[in-house]
UniProtKB/Swiss-Prot annotation:
Keywords: Cytoplasm, Endonuclease, Hydrolase, Magnesium, Metal-binding, Nuclease. PROSITE patterns: RNASE_H_2. Its EC number is 3.1.26.4. One of its GO terms (cellular component) is ribonuclease H2 complex. Residues 81-296 form the RNase H type-2 domain. It comes from Streptococcus gordonii (strain Challis / ATCC 35105 / BCRC 15272 / CH1 / DL1 / V288). This is Ribonuclease HIII. It is found in: Cytoplasm. It comes from the Bacteria. It catalyses: Endonucleolytic cleavage to 5'-phosphomonoester. Belongs to the RNase HII family. RnhC subfamily.
Length: 296
């Protein structure tokens, strides 16, 4: 379980309150000013001004306070002739696997990518992504990894958490791409945790990348190498979701909302836990919600 103790400014506290107001809860502790029950984490703002973040996704919320969370900051201006950029898709979805892609893009390829309409996958429709991905897979040197739901659950059960499993996949994708003989000037990861946590977790991996790695927020909108990875990863995730849907006979939704709870309860009724073990990330709260729906 991750834990961070920060000292944010009042302005940062109010900004956090505004963004996560729906998660605001009550606390019997008289020294807690605000208490948030977040997705897979809690946040306690004390009257002293301290902020305590705890839980599997504490890293994600610590990124909100990047000035006090000791996150890695890249140089003021990253200049490069060739870059590796990585991104992942599926970590916020109950159903489907976790896709991580590392892509190698040179300066000479940037005009081609811009004319193609490459951008952050979050701003593109699924239809556009399915059109772009085959072209990018053919033209851009990359390494794609997909951790199936079944394997994901096994890895989590073995001791990994939602953050360390992503560290392992990003590291492996970069390592395998470098093994192809390419020589990037820079390596950038779309930040999903702090640099401290990344380095702590990556030390546990067998294959480690020796070249410096920069973790940067919203990198998919800044670097084409990351944008390419974002698109290919999204395509890989959608393809996996389609295959799983066909195998189970249910249309599996992306995300982790009420729709996922409903479909999960239907799968539970039809196949039992075995159906979810091969199609969903079991440690998400959706699993318990699906069981509750089934009991009604």
């Amino acid at each position: 379980m991750g834990q961070f103790t920060l000292t944010p400014s009042e302005q940062e506290i109010q900004a956090f309150l505004k963004q996560y107001k729906k998660y605001l809860s009550s606390s019997k502790n008289p020294y807690i000013r605000y208490f948030f029950r977040l997705e897979q984490a809690t946040a306690s703002v004390y009257t002293s001004g301290k902020l305590l973040l705890q839980g599997e996704e504490a890293d994600k919320y610590a990124l909100f306070f990047k000035e006090t969370a000791d996150l890695t900051r890249p140089p003021q201006k990253i200049t490069y002739q060739a870059m590796i950029g990585t991104d992942e898709v599926g970590n916020g979805s109950y159903f489907g696997g976790l896709a991580v892609v590392a892509s190698f893009v040179t300066k000479e390829q940037e005009d081609f990518l811009r004319k193609l309409g490459v951008g952050d996958s979050k701003t593109l429709t699924d239809q556009k992504i399915r059109q772009l991905a085959p072209i990018l897979k053919e033209k851009i040197t990359h390494q794609a990894l997909l951790l199936s739901p079944k394997k994901y659950n096994q890895v989590i059960a073995s001791g990994y958490n939602a953050v360390s499993v992503k560290v392992a996949l990003h590291n492996q994708a970069i390592y395998l791409l470098l093994e192809k003989g390419i020589k990037p000037d820079q390596i950038v990861i779309d930040a999903f945790t702090s640099s401290t946590n990344y380095q702590r977790y990556v030390k546990q991996e067998r294959n480690q990348v020796s070249q410096a790695i920069h973790l940067e927020e919203k990198a998919e909108g800044k670097y084409l190498a990351v944008a390419v990875s974002s698109i290919i990863a999204r395509d890989l995730f959608l393809e996996n979701l389609e295959i799983l849907s066909q195998e189970l006979g249910y249309q599996l939704p992306s995300g982790a909302g009420a729709k996922s709870d409903q479909v999960a309860s239907q799968i539970l009724k039809a196949y039992g836990m075995a159906g979810l073990e091969t199609s969903a990330k079991l440690h998400f709260k959706n699993t318990q919600k699906a069981k509750q729906l089934l009991e009604r």
